[in-house]
UniProtKB/Swiss-Prot annotation:
Molecular functions (GO terms): nutrient reservoir activity
Function: Seed storage protein with a relatively high level of Lys and Met.
Residue ranges constituting the Cupin type-1 domain according to the UniProt record: 13-162
Taxonomic path: Eukaryota, Viridiplantae, Streptophyta, Embryophyta, Tracheophyta
Tree of life domain: Eukaryota
This protein's name: 13S globulin basic chain
Length: 194
């Protein structure tokens, strides 16, 4: 019965281990999450956790939390963090250091860029299966939007719309030197046609 389920429930998850990373970029860092899929005990708490380890100047792509608020505690290093509210206004734009805590509300966009010494943090989220939506990179929603719509919406050229859609091949963790060549952009466009 229920006693048997509680007694056999997994109660620990190592989110510090590099082998457990959910996202990894050898030039930018790694992100590991603990949610109710990995650790069912979190379902009853309605919480999840994320551990970020960004290398020197690594970037966690701009994204927003779809279904959770986030409390981010810096465990080592420093980073430039920008948070933008749901109406497009900047609500935070500063450096955070070891020992500091920052709250990022649901739907607010956030970007983190590690300092020269790198950046490590733990974020606690108010949903047992917290989800994010990246604004750039291979997993960005912009990839699904036709170029004509992007050009019209943002009043940009065809080249700028193409760069917005295909400019970064990385998924979530970005490095400063990660801009891909035009050939890869063209190859990606060609693949999406089929």
């Amino acid at each position: 019965g229920i006693d048997e389920n509680v007694c056999t429930m997994k109660l620990r998850e190592n989110i510090k281990s590099p082998q457990e990373a959910d996202f990894y970029n050898p030039k930018a860092g790694r992100i590991t999450t603990a949610n109710s899929q990995k650790l069912p005990a979190l379902r009853s708490l309605q919480m999840s956790a994320e551990r970020g380890f960004l290398y020197s100047n690594g970037i966690y792509a701009p994204h927003w939390n779809i279904n959770a608020h986030s409390a981010l505690y810096v465990t080592r290093g420093n980073a430039k963090v920008q948070v933008v509210g749901d109406e497009g206004n900047k609500v935070f734009d500063d450096e955070v250091k070891q020992g500091q805590l920052i709250i990022v509300p649901q739907y607010f966009a956030v970007i983190k860029k590690a300092g020269n010494q790198g950046f490590e943090y733990v974020a606690f989220k108010t949903n047992d299966n917290a989800m994010i939506n990246p604004l750039v990179g291979r997993l960005s929603a912009f990839r699904a939007i036709p170029e004509e719509v992007l050009r019209s919406s943002f009043q940009i050229s065809s080249e700028e719309a193409e760069e917005l859609k295909y400019g970064r091949q990385e998924a979530l963790l970005l490095s400063e030197q990660s801009q891909q060549g035009k050939r890869e952009v063209a190859d990606e466009k060609e693949r999406e046609r089929f």
